[in-house]
């Protein structure tokens, strides 16, 4: 049976005043409820990844010929059981300590099986984190609650007052509102005009930072903010309207037990290259993810992917 306890004495961990600072102990035996769901959010899952990697290197033809192979591994470094940092601050810190050891074990494994001189490592992170609880009032951070369902209802009332009776809002999901294209077409209305008018209406809501129409994202002028919105937009599957909520506000879904706090703060993530004759160096310049593939290709002295438009990093 696996048991997770702090790897260091309690005084080695740091806490903010409102964080829980009591030692933890989690068991992952066969009789526990949701054992595997909890296990995959613990640092023990990274040890399982290493065991699977060792089995792969022993039983497959990976790294056994002259043709370069790609092995992509994902380690977990998030909150235990998707709790907030306030609830599991010690677990979060302990996870990072154990993650460091898991990566060290992987390097030792690769060195034994393949040889570090034959491998190029690329370590990156998504910067993703589970939604946190709202900031306590003692920090005096502005905030509020934004209800997407109420917003969609009011938008439909506005469109009915403007264009006549009908269900103009078809549905809403994940800060996106989908309009009823069949109704708009049957009324012989201009879809782009309705999208833009709807965006102008939504921007007046409390808690709304920006409202983007599909027409604006596809045909409007470029800006850094527009570029970020476009990266997550698909013209055939995304909504007609994309709502950007102010940081500090909580997006509440009344029909489901789901809510999350919007945060726009930058979450830096490391990008580490090791091997392939790369000299030790620290580059403190923001790097776009599109430069990873050409950099790896350059280090291996092969051509970059045919859809790659970025240039490699200079070491």
What is each of the regions a protein language model found here?
Residues 1-67, 76-83, 206, 210:
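His/Asp/Glu-rich, glycine-adjacent segments
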Residues 2, 13, 90, 105-249:
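Secreted, luminal/periplasmic, and some membrane-associated catalytic domains
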Residues 32-38, 87-88, 175-184, 225, ...:
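Flexible glycine/proline-enriched surface loops and loop-helix/loop-strand junctions
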Residues 53, 68-76, 92-107, 120-128, ...:
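Beta-strand elements within well-structured catalytic alpha/beta cores of enzymes
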Residues 58-66, 111-115, 231-234, 262:
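Surface-exposed acidic, glycine-flexible loop patches that form ligand/cofactor-binding
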Residues 82-87, 132-137, 253-256:
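Short, solvent-exposed loop/turn and secondary-structure capping segments
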Residues 94, 157-175, 184-196, 262-267, ...:
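A short beta-strand-to-alpha-helix junction
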Residues 237-238, 244-277:
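C-terminal, low-complexity/hydrophilic appendages and adjacent surface loops
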């Amino acid at each position: 049976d696996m048991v997770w306890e702090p790897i260091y004495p309690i005084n080695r961990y740091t806490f903010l005043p409102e964080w829980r600072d009591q030692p933890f102990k989690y068991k992952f035996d066969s009789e526990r409820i949701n054992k595997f769901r909890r296990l995959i959010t613990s640092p023990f899952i990274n040890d399982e990844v290493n065991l699977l990697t060792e089995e792969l290197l022993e039983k497959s033809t990976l790294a056994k010929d002259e043709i370069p192979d790609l092995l992509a591994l994902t380690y977990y470094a998030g909150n235990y059981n998707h709790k907030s940092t306030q609830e599991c601050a010690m677990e979060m810190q302990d996870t990072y300590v154990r993650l460091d050891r898991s990566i060290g074990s992987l390097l030792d494994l690769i060195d034994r099986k393949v040889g570090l001189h034959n491998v190029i490592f690329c370590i990156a992170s998504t910067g993703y984190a589970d939604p946190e609880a709202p900031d306590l009032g003692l920090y005096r951070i502005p905030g509020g609650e934004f209800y997407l369902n109420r917003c969609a209802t009011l938008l439909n009332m506005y469109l009915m007052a403007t264009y006549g009776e009908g269900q103009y809002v078809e549905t809403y999901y994940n800060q996106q509102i989908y309009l009823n294209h069949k109704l708009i077409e049957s009324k012989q209305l201009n879809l782009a005009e309705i999208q833009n008018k709807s965006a102008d209406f939504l921007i007046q809501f409390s808690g709304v930072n920006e409202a983007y129409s599909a027409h604006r994202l596809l045909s409007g002028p470029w800006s850094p903010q527009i570029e970020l919105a476009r990266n997550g937009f698909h013209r055939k599957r995304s909504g007609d309207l994309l709502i950007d909520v102010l940081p500090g506000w909580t997006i509440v879904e009344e029909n489901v037990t789901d809510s999350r706090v919007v945060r726009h703060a930058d979450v830096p993530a490391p990008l580490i290259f090791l091997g392939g004759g790369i000299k030790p160096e620290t580059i403190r310049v923001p790097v776009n993810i599109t430069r990873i593939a050409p950099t790896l290709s350059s280090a291996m002295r092969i051509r970059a992917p045919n859809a790659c438009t970025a240039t490699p990093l200079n070491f």
